[in-house]
Amino acid sequence: MEQLTPLIKRFTFKRQDGQNFPRFSGGSHIIVKMNEQISNAYSLMSCTQDLSTYQVCVRKDVEGKGGSVFMHDQCNEGCEIQISEPKNLFPLAETGNKHILIAGGIGITPFLPQMDELAARGADFELHYAYRSPEHAALLDELKQKHAKHVFSYVDSEGCSLKLDELISSQPKGTHVYVCGPKPMIDAVIDCCNKHRYRDEYIHWEQFASTVPEDGEAFTVVLAKSNQEIEVQSNQTILQAIETLNIDVECLCREGVCGTCETAILEGEADHFDQYLSDAEKASQKSMMICVSRAKGKKLVLDL
């Protein structure tokens, strides 16, 4: 473990059996299971060529679900912890005239291995890294040592902000834009790309924090296999409601990114808030992630 900033720690994992971890590509994440109630997704930031270890960075958030506090306060060197195999929902495009990477705060982590991959390809790329103040600039020195001419940093506390419209509008045709960071930054980048007529397939983003509205409408869920009916409250997920019936549903992340709780929809329409299903899969209304997604109407019938 390494304390990078007052709020950010880097964790290095090794397998108990001494074997290498599975291969992964830049942009991949793993699910770290702290206990039966808490599992969080974290981007892998280690070198894709060195599989002897996996590395992640965790920013302590005392107002979060408890996972980051657990990692900071209870995870010590030598402790055992369960992690999933890597999955990549934020891969680099195989082609493109240029790649613009935009990071906010801890959102820098998936870009470390991606920058190595782009450099190895000989691709044209830039990283634009925005952070609140110098003490929040985790990994900036490492990035500049490896990719100095590709890294541009912006410090809010010093009055240096990212001029997003200028950046997006000045790129050549065929540029891919990637963003990872706080939701307002992601929304701003997507809106700016749309304004300048970037095609959807050239805009890539990742955010692990839930985007589910805090004040949703209550609705009814019918479990077809067990012939049970439950009421999902406005401040409750379908998964949480089902768990009150002691029905076991596998779910690792509880954030709509891992896909383990995907459930078939037999009747009704889902309001999708996950990052796992494609837009086409969401539109088909064949399945949903019950850890974050909700009903569009008053009733859903699920294949459970």
Curated annotation (Swiss-Prot):
Family: Belongs to the PDR/VanB family. CntB subfamily.
Residues binding [2Fe-2S] cluster: 253, 258, 261, 291
Subunit structure: Composed of an oxygenase subunit and a reductase subunit.
GO BP of this protein: carnitine metabolic process
SUPFAM superfamilies assigned to the protein according to its UniProt record, in alphabetical order: 2Fe-2S ferredoxin-like, Ferredoxin reductase-like, C-terminal NADP-linked domain, Riboflavin synthase domain-like
Cofactor: FMN; [2Fe-2S] cluster
MF annotations from Gene Ontology: 2 iron, 2 sulfur cluster binding; metal ion binding; oxidoreductase activity, acting on paired donors, with incorporation or reduction of molecular oxygen, NAD(P)H as one donor, and incorporation of one atom of oxygen
Activation/inhibition comment: Inhibited by EDTA.
Name used for this protein in its record: Carnitine monooxygenase reductase subunit
One Pfam family cited in the UniProt record for this chain: DmmA-like_N
Domain 2Fe-2S ferredoxin-type stretches: 219-304
Domain FAD-binding FR-type: 1-93
Entry note: cofactor: Binds 1 2Fe-2S cluster.
Biochemical pathway: Amine and polyamine metabolism; carnitine metabolism
Organism, scientific name: Acinetobacter pittii (strain PHEA-2)
EC number: 1.14.13.239
HAMAP family: Carnitine_monoox_B (MF_02098)
Catalytic activity: (R)-carnitine + NADH + O2 + H(+) = (3R)-3-hydroxy-4-oxobutanoate + trimethylamine + NAD(+) + H2O; (R)-carnitine + NADPH + O2 + H(+) = (3R)-3-hydroxy-4-oxobutanoate + trimethylamine + NADP(+) + H2O
Enzyme class: oxidoreductase
Free-text function comment from the UniProt entry: Converts carnitine to trimethylamine and malic semialdehyde. Acts on both enantiomers.
Entry keyword set: 2Fe-2S, Flavoprotein, FMN, Iron, Iron-sulfur, Metal-binding, NAD, NADP, Oxidoreductase
